[in-house]
Amino acid sequence: MDVLYSLSKTLKDARDKIVEGTLYSNVSDLIQQFNQMVITMNGNEFQTGGIGNLPIRNWNFDFGLLGTTLLNLDANYVETARNTIDYFVDFVDNVCMDEMVRESQRNGIAPQSDSLRKLSGVKFKRINFDNSSEYIENWNLQNRRQRTGFTFHKPNIFPYSASFTLNRSQPAHDNLMGTMWLNAGSEIQVAGFDYSCAINAPANTQQFEHIVQLRRVLTTATITLLPDAERFSFPRVINSADGTTTWYFNPVIFRPNNVEIEFLLNGQIINNYQARFGTIIARNFDTIRLSFQLMRPPPQNMTPAVAALFPNAPPFEHHATVGLTLRIESAICESVLADASETMLANVTSVRQEYAVPVGPVFPPGMNWTDLITNYSPSREDNLQRVFTVASIRSMLIK
């Protein structure tokens, strides 16, 4: 993997900097590195493809070296370099695709394609290394089973989940009380509702709670917490739990009271925030517990218009609702996760779909992320680490 990254980095720099008119002295170090790459690769043969519709291609390396000059690089010099660069780029692209479409239940962190296995040989270590890539650094750590740490802008840690629970229900579904939620990616939205606006609740207050267990531990998380759940702020028709009927939800939004959020690790509270919105920090957690209340305003605090919305007896045409939105803006995770700000999952999925790669023993059909993160096994993590690393290498050359 180190060699593949070094090849890609060298080729990217060469493609960007070996251009007509450039002073040789400005790129002499790069050209020496380029020539070392050519010397190491010359005389070797590789084969890529042969899985799904990815065609088999044979690669032979026999290229001349770039010379020295006291002047600027001319058109002939650049054209010679470009021919070599284009062939090498095509080779790296195919090695990456060949690697991205393969998976293994055992030691999925190790190279799976014949071409990348060959590049891992001792003879290719002479290619100049550049391990500045975060993915490469973490691949090396994961490969040695040492601690890894991945910084993501928006980690897709929550499997998609959209449902509701009813704490009070009737066959007519005309006086309901319960909780709705939508968890996906890096965001949780949860709403508590009571058709009767807590008219018969103790102290005219309804208590709601929403608990989310993460599939992996997050640390040093920057989180936004808002006293609203906009996805549950408009009328809708909802299917009943048994699917035999539908019920009408017509929310009128209240601000939640006594909001408390707890971040827990192995059942122990690590961070606790009460009535605090905006940006908050969670140090280390694998579970999030949100609790909040709906409080019915005293009659003297209701204007006639508000009192008309929430009568003391049925029918209840408007439904009191409170909600919260929790959004993980950034966090550190020791596991490999898809990230809203990166294209690795999209790149891997696109290549696998484009070449009709058959479903293997590790990844679900279509690389369904909800399935992946819901059943996140060590085997899946190893394979994701490898294919995401390769995807990051490929993205240096192929946009």
UniProtKB/Swiss-Prot annotation:
Gene3D superfamilies: 2.60.120.170, Viral capsid alpha domain (1.10.1350.10). InterPro entries: Capsid_hemagglutn, Rotavirus_A/C_VP6, Virus_capsid_a-hlx_vir. The keyword Metal-binding applies. Keywords: Calcium, Capsid protein, Intermediate capsid protein, Metal-binding, Ubl conjugation, Virion, Zinc. GO terms for cellular component: viral envelope; viral intermediate capsid. GO terms for molecular function: host cell surface receptor binding; metal ion binding; structural molecule activity. One of its GO terms (biological process) is fusion of virus membrane with host plasma membrane. It is found in: Virion. Zn(2+) binds at residue 153. The N-terminus is blocked. Belongs to the rotavirus VP6 family. Homotrimer. Interacts with the inner capsid protein VP2. Interacts with the outer capsid glycoprotein VP7. Interacts with the outer capsid protein VP5*. This is Intermediate capsid protein VP6.
